[in-house]
Amino acid sequence: MPQLNPAPWFSIMVMTWLTLALLIQPKLLTFTTTNPPSKKPSLITKPTPWAWPWT
């Protein structure tokens, strides 16, 4: 079965991951987010309890 022979496919996989890690990823990490996170504390509201009709 040729699927079990990793010789041609392992090198393709390694080259693909190296390309992703060394060339594409640093370019993607330089982009800034459109909405940076703020340092304000979030307003947490306490939910009102549900009035169950059978209690």
Curated annotation (Swiss-Prot):
Annotated segments matching region Disordered: 35-55
Signal peptide: none
Keywords assigned: ATP synthesis, CF(0), Hydrogen ion transport, Ion transport, Membrane, Mitochondrion, Transmembrane, Transmembrane helix, Transport
One Gene Ontology term from the biological process aspect of the record: proton motive force-driven ATP synthesis
UniProt GO MF annotations: proton transmembrane transporter activity
InterPro entries, per the entry: ATP8_metazoa (IPR001421), ATPase_protein_8 (IPR050635)
Transmembrane segments: 8-24
Record note on quaternary structure: Component of the ATP synthase complex composed at least of ATP5F1A/subunit alpha, ATP5F1B/subunit beta, ATP5MC1/subunit c (homooctomer), MT-ATP6/subunit a, MT-ATP8/subunit 8, ATP5ME/subunit e, ATP5MF/subunit f, ATP5MG/subunit g, ATP5MK/subunit k, ATP5MJ/subunit j, ATP5F1C/subunit gamma, ATP5F1D/subunit delta, ATP5F1E/subunit epsilon, ATP5PF/subunit F6, ATP5PB/subunit b, ATP5PD/subunit d, ATP5PO/subunit OSCP.
Function, in words: Subunit 8, of the mitochondrial membrane ATP synthase complex (F(1)F(0) ATP synthase or Complex V) that produces ATP from ADP in the presence of a proton gradient across the membrane which is generated by electron transport complexes of the respiratory chain. ATP synthase complex consist of a soluble F(1) head domain - the catalytic core - and a membrane F(1) domain - the membrane proton channel. These two domains are linked by a central stalk rotating inside the F(1) region and a stationary peripheral stalk.
The protein's name: ATP synthase F(0) complex subunit 8
